[in-house]
Structure formats: structure tokens, C-alpha cells
Amino acid sequence: VLPLNRKGALSVLCINTWHTGFHGSLWFDDRSWQLIQLVECPNCIHMFLCLQGADAMVLESVMFAILAERELGPKLYGIFPQGRLEQFVPSRKLSTDELSVPGIFDEIAEKITRFHGMRMPFNKEPKWLFGTMEKYMDQVLQLTFTREHHLRNFSRLLSYNLPQEMDSLKCLLESTPSPVVFCHNDLQEGNILLLNGRENTDRQRLMLIDFEYSSYNYRGFDIGNFFCEWTYDYTYDKFPFFITNTKKYPTKAQQMHFFQRYLLESHAGFENLSEEDQQKLKEDMLVEVNRFALASHFFWGLWSVIQAKISTIEFGYMEYAMARFDAYFELKKKLRV
């Protein structure tokens, strides 16, 4: 977040890095960052520095601009070769436990439905999920570790024959109908803002952020990933800096409530269907979403193994990878697939 002077120009900056935990870092002005709490938009903006390739940056900026225009994300004020200037939104991130709070839960369902209804100028073939997982798998199989606990956990992961397991998962999901929609692909509490001043309102109090993984993908993955995130708390202040509780995975009743809200928003004429037909659509989504939740565990498990090797952020990435693969096999057993 950067302070602006009265003419809208940036102040002189002394940039330092502030690690934020699971996914990355923010940059702040060492001289003036504490003043941020005293100013309001549009007196301050958020500067996003992008370290990825130019093509990816252009695509993400186009996506960001469209989402901002449709009020599904922060406003876009400008772009430059290595990043962009975004609206600073006075807010706080949700906590893990808030994901299941009924009013918040309902609005998240509405936001996801609107997101999935977007028509974006990108390739609509659902290549992102397994294309990315195959790339991650290739990287994982080439990794080496020297730290003893990393070696021990990595050896255990390799004993699962992950390439064969991924092929099995791919076959399962190819036989599982799931509409291709524009997905966020990283729906977790840290990417959902509760807007200041709207905490006690019934609607329009939330905003989705962080669209770096967004693409056309299977609906089941986006919702399944969101359900998986109910079980992970990334605010724990001791190593490995997260807590897993798979018992917090949404119950069937909670999932069916979510599907009801989702289908009311997305399925034309859903409210006019018979109760039996509505139930059938929700039962189909139950199978779809929980099977794709397996892909969420597998995807972020592979991602986290790579982060254990390359990331400088203080987080137990290898432990997180183990937690995700443990949850994968636990859910697979429960689903009997």
C-alpha cells in the first residue's frame, strides 16, 4: 500500500519486504507505512509487483481490469512493466472459522456463482488443472533435499507412486461431469476480504482478491478447493505455521445448502423444478465437488513440495504437503474411489 500526495503522485519510497505467510510477500514503504492506518482511499493505493513473465502479467492485468469493472475485485488504477497499481480496500481477511458462518457462507456462494458466470477473453479449454499438475509433477520428481526431515517426508511421498496416483485421479475426474467455468482456483479465507464498515450488513460485505491462479477450469475444483480450505488455519504462530483439522470439512447438510444457493443463482429455472429434480441436481454436485476436492489436495500438495525447496518464507511447506496428501488419501478412502 502506497501513500499519495495531494496531487496523486507517489511519495519517495524506501521499499522493504514483509513476508505474509503462506503464499508470498508484500512490499511496504519503510518510512511511512504506519501512516496507512490513518488514511483512506483514494489517498492510498496498493502496488502489486509481479515477478512472472510479461505475457502472464498482461493476461492477469486484463483479467483484473474486467473483474474490477464488474465489481468482483479491487479497482485497477494503472499498470507498468513489472506490476500494477490497485485500489487499496480497507478491510481484513476472513478467518478460517468464518468460512462456515451462515451469512458469510451464503455470500461466498453468491460471489463464487457470479465469478463462474463471467465470460472472459481467454482459452476456454480446461487445460489448466492437469497441465499445471503435470508441470509440478515433473519438477517434484527432479527435486533433491538435504535436510533430514525433508528427506524423510519426501521419501514417504515418493513411496506413494505419485505419477501413477495422478493418472488414476485424472481417469476418475474425466468420468465425473463438471461444467467448465471461469474459476478463481484459490478460494481460501486469505483471499476473501471482509470490507470495513459492512461487517453487520447482510450483503455485499465481501470481496474476492488474488487472481493469479484464475482460469477456465472445472467447477468442481473451485468449490471442492473452497471446502478443503475449511480444514486449514494458516494463522498459527509456531512451526509449521498452520493447523489441520479435517473434521471441519463441511458436512453434507452444509454442502447441500451451498449447492442450493449456487444453483438458485446459476441454474435458470431451478426454483421451478420439482423438489425431486432439485435434490437430484444437488446430489450430482455432491459427487462432483467431493471428487474434485481430491484434485485440490493433490494440486496444492505438489505445489507445496516445490515451495519447500525454493521458498524463503518461514512456513512448513513440506509438512503442509504431507498434510494435503494425507487428506487426499483419507478423502479417497471415504469416497471409495
Model-derived features with residue positions:
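Active-site acidic catalytic loop and adjacent metal/ATP-binding pocket
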Residues: 3-13, 17, 21-28, 32-37, ...
